[in-house]
Amino acid sequence: MDNAVIVHYHSCKGHYFQLSLWQWRDGKLGKDAYFSRFDSFGAVAYLTYPAPYFLSHAYVIVKDQFWHYQTVDFRIERDYGVPKTEVWLVDGDPTVYYSRQAAVASRHYGRCDVHAFDMAVNSQAFDKRWGFSGWLGFRYQPEETSFRLWAPTAEKVELILYASTDERASVARVLPMQRGQQYSPDHHAENTCGVWDISLRGDYNYHAYCYRVYYRRRTFRDTRDPYAIATTANGKRSIVIAPEHLRPQGFSVKQGKEATWRLDNPNQAVIYEMHVRDFSKSETSGVSLANRGKFKGLIETGTRNAFGDSTCFDYVKSLGITHIQLQPIFDHHQFFDDNGDYAYNWGYDPENYNVPAASFTSNPHEPATRILELKEVIQAYHDAGINVIMDVVYNHTYSSRESAFQLTVPDYYYRMNPNGSFQNGSGCGNETASEKEMYRKYMLDSILYWTNEFNIDGFRFDLMGLHDIDTMNLIRQELDKIDPRILVFGEGWDMGVGLAAEQKAKKENASKMPGIGFFNDDQRNAVKGAEVYGSFEKGFVSGAPTEGLVAKSILGSDELVSYCTPSQVINYVEAHDNYNLNDLLWVLNPEDSKQDHVKRVQLASAMTILMQGIYFMQLGQEFLRTKLYPTGQDKELTQADRERAGYFCLLSRIKRL
């Protein structure tokens, strides 16, 4: 493995020609290395640190030939999975910078610009100057299409149009965009000085496009539109589609009293979490081969297994649940197997937030198909009286450096450290900054798009504790204007250090967010036990003395956390993360008979569904789904599985009484 590092070095005096580098890694002797070119920052060197494995860090010194001059030892931290690390070093400054803008703000830099990194470290002033509250993306009409991109730090932006919607199509036209001229820091609807736009006469339906953003005169990157609603199959180019081409037959958006499937009392909700691919991928599902693992597999009817029992959509309709929750259905990073087919992926790798995932559609190369098919799914569940909740992941992006956000306005949309590295409260390499005006706007615009365009009935926020309270309350307020019965809840874990504790949308701050729900891990652990970093703890159903916590959970958990109402409490004993209930109880009680084991599972589910609050479960929990081994021969449901599912069906009906 090369473990490549690009080093940019700036000398205030401009003395470069006598300089070289000394590079090394732990446990190995060092060697000389040399600068190979110059750029506007200074000298540039391309280094490799060959090793049979990924290096988490490496070292370098800048020196002259005889070591009369040398810098401090620079330790370069490398992000796992990123093949090439780029750093900026400044003469006299011991800091390793991971952003050019952060390095230019160093007082040791020859042409120091103290405001160069304001978008990261002084965002309130940056937002006041550059914030914009108008529409972004594209607006289509048959006679004219307009494009808008917010890119205040860009020196120039061009619109790139492609010859077709094929991901390999050649460039057809390159058109200059114009920067807005109006500066209005107190009225952001009119503050266009950071917005680039262009209007094109003619019909641009089904045209692929991207933006070419120039950071400096000759330095640019091409990026998809952050506000894209359709993309090429690989997600790298955006596509204009006329609204009338995105309405499948029979689909209609209904809100308020017209949305008769929504619940007036959220505490009656029974939420059923599932993954699009998992739902129908098995050959035992009875779903037609073409639809297995796809959006269409969610609604195919008449499916049966080898025993003649109803499966998939027909089965879900028989359960008595009120909501399904779909694990991420937006466009996420795509992995492929050896045959070039889409590989299994939970979907928590966001790339295009407003675009349905290509891997779930019958034809990823036809950009409207995935939109139409997802709308057909939502309509079918609404017709069956079932709400559809969307699992959203606004807390991080798959790539830090290659996301549309970073390519458009570098270092703005994320929480950054002073040295230009990304904060990583998500554990995924970065965390977004919901407290900044334009990412808050993006989150809200995206949520409203899914609500108004797809008729989504609720949103489950992944790692919600990384978002700020004001943003989450704003989302709740705007959804209330549409329909207050739309659910908003999430993972209120305390993660990251980028926000003050009192600003985090974590469960300990539940009283500050009265219309938002939180997963109740206190109740979960008290009832079933827990697996924490490889160690296991028993809960009530395994004989642990947690009666006090269980009693408080039954009464609404407000003595455990400052919940305002039971509807803020999401009670559960199984979700897609960690051990399934069935597996955990086998680990905690390995000597149980099958009969005793089933009774423990049933007790955990029954206790939880009858507690005050909203009930949440994972697909298959009702028939002892396992992550470790199949329950029946050839992955078939056994008679015992069907009996257990029947037991849950009774419980779900009790919940709605």
Segments and roles (model prediction):
Residues 1-13, 39-146, 188-273, 278-297:
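The feature marks proteins involved in alpha-glucan
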Residues 9-13, 150-153, 202, 328, ...:
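Non-cytosolic beta-sheet module surface loops
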Residues 13-17, 151-157, 577:
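Short proline/glycine-enriched turn/loop motifs at strand-loop junctions of beta-rich domains
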Residues 29-38, 171-194, 198:
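Short, surface-exposed loop motifs enriched in S/T, G, D/E and P with embedded aromatic residues
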Residues 149, 154-175:
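Beta-strand-rich binding/interaction modules
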Residues 241-246, 476-655:
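Conserved alpha/beta catalytic core and glycan-binding cleft of carbohydrate-active enzymes
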Residues 270-272, 324-326, 388-390, 459, ...:
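Hydrophobic faces of well-ordered beta-strands that scaffold small-molecule active sites
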Residues 275-454, 471-483, 487:
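Substrate-binding/active-site clefts of carbohydrate-active enzymes
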